[in-house]
């Protein structure tokens, strides 16, 4: 059969109901030998279904699809994705996805296997939600991932994950996290005791503002852990504690944070899927966005000086203005009543504890003074690992490559671990979001070795250089904009 005729023949079979095959494949994606061949050489695929706790196999024929067919379904109104060679139509269900609809849309038409494994705890339970969405599987002759991806790299990364699971690297040390929570609560209680004992003088106000700032920053890191389900074995306990830490202790919406942050994790530094780099028109970042703005002669502000705006705007106002207002807006527009109740308890707590000393207006000022001081801390920690790294439009690389090219690490020290909430191990965190952070340093050598094997640059830099690279990156982007704007 000629190549053209073979392609035409395969295309005519795409999406059609195929004879069925037992729901098992070899590592290379080929069907195992216990399938029953039919007249046309195809075999039947049966989906396992449990009935009354017994392993009964109910015959359910699945369609077979090529990657070419799957990639056509990549729009918000028509979303298919692949997990472990199974094809799912998530179009109508995306709005019900606990992690947000956009995360699914970002993988429409793609293999989402590694992202699925990375972002969930109990895969068996989660797959129950996927069962009604199953429409077929990859044709036996199709590779398990898109043809542009390095199959050996994908296999090596999955073997690494299995190794880490066997080493119990995904098991949390609860003592570590509860000591961290104790640190936060002790700082807050200390601030109130000092205020109660010494009064609300300027010196005392400065001191307690410092204590509350440290508490809030460390609270940011703890809520980040809980949002990623890395503390408890059960998702529900992580979610409940996340409400307490993020909403009650910080006064921000947990759901808002998760829906935003998960997008960043699955597609870091990818336009327009990563909300963390959607900072235009105030800032232009990366190499492509500045040139795009420049060629279109767009000049909302003086971009030549955007590195100065970073100091004047991004550092002090990220937490008290941008995050705070966006959190409130999303909570009320999407009617997150649970989060609204929890966040209300944050303000009630502050008015009860600090209101008698400062009054209502003074307490509000204290809240936002603390957020204002905390903001540069969080801005530096969150931006130093991403802003200087590669930014691009969707290229659909494998999970390891996607994360490594968009992130970098900061040298380890006791201070760096504490100051960054262990986000100095940003590469390991992005590869394994549900891994407890106290294990990052243990897996880093294995990740570095895998990167070296496949020619991926594993960047690890001093913290002060990382701070400086943010500004240098903004200057570089400004220069690209200038060249395109004035050419």
Curated annotation (Swiss-Prot):
It comes from Mus musculus. GO terms for cellular component: endoplasmic reticulum membrane. GO terms for biological process: unsaturated fatty acid biosynthetic process. The gene is Fads2b. It is a multi-pass membrane protein. Heme binds at residues 97, 120. Keywords: Electron transport, Endoplasmic reticulum, Fatty acid biosynthesis, Fatty acid metabolism, Heme, Iron, Lipid biosynthesis, Lipid metabolism, Membrane, Metal-binding, Oxidoreductase, Transmembrane, Transmembrane helix, Transport. Residues 1-11 have a biased composition (Basic and acidic residues). Pfam families: Cyt-b5, FA_desaturase. The lineage of its organism: Eukaryota, Metazoa, Chordata, Craniata, Vertebrata. A motif (Histidine box-2) lies at residues 261-265. Residues 62-139 form the Cytochrome b5 heme-binding domain. Residues 1-20 are annotated as: Disordered. This is Fatty acid desaturase 2-like protein FADS2B. Pathway: Lipid metabolism; polyunsaturated fatty acid biosynthesis. Residues 197-201, 329-349 are lumenal. A motif (Histidine box-3) lies at residues 426-430. SUPFAM superfamilies: Cytochrome b5-like heme/steroid binding domain. The chain crosses the membrane at residues 176-196, 202-222, 308-328, 350-370. A motif (Histidine box-1) lies at residues 224-228. Belongs to the fatty acid desaturase type 1 family. It is found in: Endoplasmic reticulum membrane. InterPro entries: Cyt_B5-like_heme/steroid-bd (IPR001199), Cyt_B5-like_heme/steroid_sf (IPR036400), FA_desaturase_dom (IPR005804), Fatty_acid_desaturase (IPR012171). Residues 1-175, 223-307, 371-487 are cytoplasmic. GO terms for molecular function: metal ion binding; oxidoreductase activity. PANTHER family: FATTY ACID DESATURASE 2, FATTY ACID DESATURASE 2-LIKE PROTEIN FADS2B-RELATED. Gene3D superfamilies: Cytochrome b5-like heme/steroid binding domain (3.10.120.10). The histidine box domains may contain the active site and/or be involved in metal ion binding.
């Amino acid at each position: 059969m000629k190549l053209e005729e073979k392609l035409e023949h395969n295309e005519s079979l795409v999406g059609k109901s195929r004879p069925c095959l037992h729901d098992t494949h070899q590592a290379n994606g080929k069907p195992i030998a216990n399938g029953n061949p039919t007249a046309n050489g195809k075999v039947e695929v049966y989906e396992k279904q449990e009935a009354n706790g017994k392993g009964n196999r109910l015959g359910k024929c699945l369609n077979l699809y090529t990657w070419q067919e799957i990639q056509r379904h990549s729009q918000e109104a028509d979303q298919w994705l692949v997990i472990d060679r199974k094809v799912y139509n998530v179009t109508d269900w995306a709005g019900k996805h606990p992690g947000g609809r956009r995360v699914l849309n970002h993988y429409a038409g793609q293999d989402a296997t590694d992202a699925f494994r990375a972002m969930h705890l109990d895969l068996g339970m989660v797959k129950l939600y996927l069962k009604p969405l199953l429409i077929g599987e990859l044709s036996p002759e199709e590779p398990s991932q898109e043809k542009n991806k390095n199959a050996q790299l994908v296999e090596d990364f999955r073997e690494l994950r299995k190794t880490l699971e066997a080493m119990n690297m995904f098991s949390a040390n609860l003592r570590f996290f509860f000591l961290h929570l104790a640190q936060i609560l002790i700082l807050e209680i200390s601030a109130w005791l000092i205020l109660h004992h010494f009064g609300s003088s300027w010196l005392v106000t400065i001191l307690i503002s410092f204590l509350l700032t440290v508490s809030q920053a460390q609270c940011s890191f703890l809520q980040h852990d809980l949002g990623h389900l890395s503390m408890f074995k059960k998702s529900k306990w992580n979610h409940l504690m996340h409400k307490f830490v993020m909403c009650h202790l910080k006064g921000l919406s947990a759901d808002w944070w998760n829906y935003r942050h998960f997008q960043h994790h699955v597609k870091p530094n990818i336009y327009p899927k990563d909300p963390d780099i959607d900072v235009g028109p105030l800032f232009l970042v990366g190499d492509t966005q500045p040139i795009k703005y420049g060629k279109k002669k767009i000049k909302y502000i003086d971009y030549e000086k955007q590195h100065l705006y970073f100091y004047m705007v991004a550092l002090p106002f990220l937490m008290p203005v941008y995050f705070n207002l966006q959190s409130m807006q999303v909570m009320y527009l999407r009617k997150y009543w649970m989060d609204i109740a929890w966040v209300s308890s944050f303000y009630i707590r502050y008015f009860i504890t600090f209101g008698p000393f400062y009054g209502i207006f003074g307490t509000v000022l204290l809240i936002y003074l603390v957020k204002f001081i905390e903001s540069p801390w969080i801005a530096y920690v969150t931006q130093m690992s991403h802003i200087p790294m590669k930014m691009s439009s969707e290229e659909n690389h494998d999970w390891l490559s996607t994360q490594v090219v968009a992130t970098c690490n900061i040298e380890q020290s006791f201070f760096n671990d504490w100051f960054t909430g262990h986000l100095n191990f940003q590469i390991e965190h992005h590869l394994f979001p549900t891994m407890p952070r106290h294990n990052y340093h243990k897996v880093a050598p294995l990740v570095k070795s895998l990167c070296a094997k496949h020619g991926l640059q594993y960047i690890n830099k001093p913290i002060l250089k990382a701070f400086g690279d943010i500004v240098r990156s903004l200057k570089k982007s400004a220069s690209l904009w200038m060249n395109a704007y004035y050419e």
